[in-house]
Amino acid sequence: MVDVNRFKSMQITLASPSKVRSWSYGEVKKPETINYRTLKPEREGLFDEVIFGPTKDWECACGKYKRIRYRGIVCDRCGVEVTRTKVRRERMGHIELKAPVSHIWYFKGIPSRMGLTLDMSPRALEEVIYFAAYVVIDPKDTPLEHKSIMTEREYRERLREYGYGSFVAKMGAEAIQDLLKQVDLEKEIAELKEELKTATGQKRVKAIRRLDVLDAFYKSGNKPEWMILNILPVIPPDLRPMLQLDGGRFASSDLNDLYRRVINRNNRLARLLELNAPGIIVQNEKRMLQEAVDALIDNGRRGRPITGPGSRPLKSLSHMLKGKQGRFRQNLLGKRVDFSGRSVIAVGPTLKMYQCGVPREMAIELFKPFVMREIVARDIVQNVKAAKRLVERGDERIWDILEEVIKEHPVLLNRAPTLHRLGIQAFEPVLIDGKALRLHPLVCEAYNADFDGDQMAIHVPLSEEAQAEARILMLAAEHILNPKDGKPVVTPSQDMVLGNYYLTMEEAGREGEGMVFKDRDEAVMAYRNGYVHLHSRVGIATDSLNKPWTEEQRHKVLLTTVGKILFNDIMPEGLPYLQEPNNANLTEGVPAKYFLPLGGDIKEAISNLELNPPFKKKNLGNIIAEIFKRFRTTETSALLDRMKNLGYHHSTLAGLTVGIADIPVVDDKAEIIEESHKRVEQITKQFRRGMITDDERYNAVTAEWRAAREKLEKRLIANQDPKNPIVMMMDSGARGNISNFSQLAGMRGLMAAPNGRIMELPILSNFREGLSVLEMFFSTHGARKGMTDTALKTADSGYLTRRLVDVAQDVIIREDDCGTDRGLLIRSIAEGKEMIESLEERLNGRYTKKTVKHPETGAVIIGPNELITEDKAREIVNAGVEEVTIRSVFTCNTRHGVCRHCYGINLATGDAVEVGEAVGTIAAQSIGEPGTQLTMRTFHTGGVASNTDITQGLPRVQEIFEARNPKGEAVITEVKGQVTAIEEDASTRTKKVFVKGETGEGEYVVPFTARMRVEVGGQVARGAALTEGSIQPKRLLAVRDVLSVETYLLGEVQKVYRSQGVEIGDKHIEVMVRQMIRKVRVMDPGDTDLLMGTLMDINDFTDANKDVLIAGGVPATGRPVLMGITKASLETNSFLSAASFQETTRVLTDAAIRGKKDHLLGLKENVIIGKIIPAGTGMARYRNLEPHAVNEEEYLNPPVEEEGNEETTEVVVDTAVETVEETVE
């Protein structure tokens, strides 16, 4: 076997007959599998030990040679080599076919590769191959055309006409093989290139397609006649096993049935040929052989599939590769692993951020080898076998050893579905009793876990390196920030929020108000002994608190509450004292009004101060973000644990309860509803009198009921008691929102009908009063729709993530700086008046391209190629700068990835991104993970002016990334200039928009009902939308440059996500969009050897042009192509990645003809072949480090190394019938 971590590339080609023979260890001549009595493989059968190797390790079939000492000996009695059984997984056999057979992939695929090579229609090919017609192979002197088709009857007539032997015509795959042998690739290619110079329309398209296939054969060195099989490989028997079930029956792989049919028909054909049977019988047998081979390679591709018992189609070789259950996705891209377990999760409130609780019985099983090694090392027993027995008996001594073994040995916890990289994190195990895994409450948000029965899987990293990586890179305490937006993902929730909210409340007139304490301990003691209430405002000597005070503040008394003193106790020392829940206090310190000079009147000072609101969930989030910014991970995770403990403690002390009496009653609800009823009557009257249309009536009625609900909501908010438990839960952000509250106490309002239209009858009751039967019935529609939507959305969003990951999986940070000379000019994204993403948000964490100067003073704010920090971004925006040129992924020149400067900071860490970071996968997860939060709806723009539906939510995101024609497409102008007129044409129900510019005039026809975006006299740019709606990006690409299209797509994706309140960093969308515009279509090859009309990577295109320009030739011209993510994934340079994504057979067929080489640059390819992935610590620059003793002389003057001298082997993979097998050449 090849050492998998050593080879550089993998090639797939067509297998020549000699190649198949070289793989084979013998011919399979009989259809038998195993003997029903002895259960031993039959001689020359499908499981023959002579061909495929012994069924028992180091033992021949007859038992003459047993034991390892005879390895490599071939038994003289039974002819079986003495070796490992494992060879039965890798040794192949073959079947010598008595008649050539066509390979269905190359004949049936779309486009038919055989058809293009021979310039024959697939229909004609089918007739010839399946013995329905003759094809002329050599017309000799007759007027017949070469490759023309004739029926049996015509053939006989021609023979009579021209005489026997006057021309050659054949049928079957043999005929096609002869024709393929006649193809002169060089000559045909030259002719096609000539033809392309003049051809147009369909002819041109066909010529380009033929040229593509012929050129592929020519360049790869594959012979076209290899598409016809004379010899069929038989895959190793352990890949198509027969298993004995209890009850003496056998379960066998379908492939054995399919091979058996081929062998039976082949043997029968051999016999008929020996007997010189009549031609028609031989023909029929050859046709049946052809069908048997078709079924073996791809059952069901042509005609009805061959079925097994219960009319179930048999699984052929192609099916073994295809789909979710196929070889690629089931066994290569992800496998089941040992040293893993799963269990229900329970909450572990006492754990530290980096810990998880693992049940004892689970841990002993998972860490068994480590425990056994330690038992032997301590001389408790002498060997591993005895140690194993000790562990399995559950000896008392093993538990102490287990405790020691798991110290410092992190484990990974994973919750399905793993939507982003925070779905797998590392923890230090803590042994617990019980059978449930214990999870820290703060990491629940990252996992999206709750404790209503969720299960989680646990994995043990085994090697030292794996443990080190888990500890350094994956420890839960390190994952404070969310990679999608750089905001903290671990914010306290529920009880923790409630406790801190209650703790920091302020109340007037509670016991102990106005007392003054000398230090924290005195204040807390007074509180513990009941002299002062947690919420009372008191004074404390400022200098007793260890905080960054000014000299003046130090000698005063601080007015605060005991609760806030306790709250500030848990904060790091460098942070200001937190008195008000706002950002000013957090960054600049306590406002002056809270300081009282020594000897001042404290009662009066307190009465002059307003009560502060308590700290809510949002404020806690801001505090965490600020602490992370200042102190980084270690301090932040320690603070989070302290905040968690404080929150749980005080929510327990607060003792919040909820009863029916806590739901307030709105006194004037009846009047508000009565008023609305009257208004609705007036609206209906207007409609009856014909003053308004039905649409207007409907809109007015629904608007009226919405207003009524809002009025009730406002009353509720105005009259609420801040100490009401429900209000406290809602206000603190612990649970529930104003909408839930108003359904409990106000009214439920309007409901949606099953068709998505809002019903005019509102639900007037709230949950406290209870609903009537009719109201209850109405509200069930919405509930059901919600459940269905969620289920559908999850599947859709998961599939979107899969496509995104696939298209960007090879985008890795490859170098420090690509040295590009281009940048991206950015400004804030806005839709009309509404701000979608501010300039400050877009600048944070990016590198500048040009110097940014103050627009008024001209002072330099930041130089070129510098990192824009949060503070710098704020400074730029405050200076009034509206647009900045930054380094962007769009303009990065790095091949197969991005450079550090164009990417900016890694949002998950807040530092500059490291070389080796798999930013493509992170981008895909960041866009896909919130997909489930987006809606599934297509909104109807209510009422009058809508003939277009605006797609939003998940369908819109898919529409953008798949580059589809949008629903409700906007009309765009190709001319830059002024709108001169808009004319309405009532007869055709359209409008015409006229645009006049310097380069020419444009006239655009717009639907009558479309809403216009422009007015007469307005200026429009090229590619600007004239009507409301989404622009079709492919049209935009035709009139504008690539960067404009990329910028447009970026803005569109942001609009969808931001409108749903989901924040995603621009750079993630940039990575995805860049992958959609990586290809160029060659329009004119110039002097290069590129083919016209082919799609190729931008980098390869520029390389080809570079060579020609250096030689002084004419470069090729190309046009950038925008592809949807699915198409882009299939067009990737890696055939392994594409084949494992979708359309496996088509990808492999194409790759084999081209003799494609996979250079293993992406992640998937390497996972498939079992090589360490080239990202993170798997990158060559980190892997090829040799530890050596430092020689000072060398250290100061390092020797220059030559490049490209690492030892590698090339691996060539051939596809024959379908087997992908590795051979080293």
UniProtKB/Swiss-Prot annotation:
Pfam families noted in UniProt: RNA_pol_Rpb1_1 (PF04997), RNA_pol_Rpb1_2 (PF00623), RNA_pol_Rpb1_3 (PF04983), RNA_pol_Rpb1_4 (PF05000), RNA_pol_Rpb1_5 (PF04998)
What binding details are noted for the cofactor? Binds 1 Mg(2+) ion per subunit.
- Residues noted as binding Zn(2+) 2 in the record, renumbered to the chain: 818, 892, 899, 902
One GO cellular-component annotation of the UniProt record comes to: DNA-directed RNA polymerase complex
Q: What is its EC number?
A: 2.7.7.6
Kindly list the positions annotated as binding Mg(2+).
450, 452, 454
The record's annotation in SMART domains points to:
RPOLA_N
Q: Which InterPro entries match?
A: DNA-dir_RpoC_beta_prime, DNA-dir_RpoC_beta_prime_bact, RNA_pol_asu, RNA_pol_N, RNA_pol_Rpb1_1, RNA_pol_Rpb1_3, RNA_pol_Rpb1_3_sf, RNA_pol_Rpb1_4
- Protein's GO biological process: DNA-templated transcription
Q: Which cofactor does it need?
A: Mg(2+); Zn(2+)
Among the GO molecular function terms of this UniProt record, one is: DNA binding
Q: Enumerate the residues binding Zn(2+) 1.
A: 60, 62, 75, 78
Its top-level enzyme class, in one word, is transferase
Keyword terms of this UniProt record: DNA-directed RNA polymerase, Magnesium, Metal-binding, Nucleotidyltransferase, Transcription, Transferase, Zinc
Does Cytoplasm appear among the keywords? no
- Reactions performed catalytically: RNA(n) + a ribonucleoside 5'-triphosphate = RNA(n+1) + diphosphate
What PANTHER family does the record point to? DNA-DIRECTED RNA POLYMERASE, DNA-DIRECTED RNA POLYMERASE SUBUNIT BETA
Q: How does it assemble?
A: The RNAP catalytic core consists of 2 alpha, 1 beta, 1 beta' and 1 omega subunit. When a sigma factor is associated with the core the holoenzyme is formed, which can initiate transcription.
Q: Which family is annotated? A: Belongs to the RNA polymerase beta' chain family.
According to its UniProt entry, the function of this protein is described as: DNA-dependent RNA polymerase catalyzes the transcription of DNA into RNA using the four ribonucleoside triphosphates as substrates.
- Protein's UniProt name: DNA-directed RNA polymerase subunit beta'
Q: Which organism is it from?
A: Streptococcus pneumoniae serotype 4 (strain ATCC BAA-334 / TIGR4)
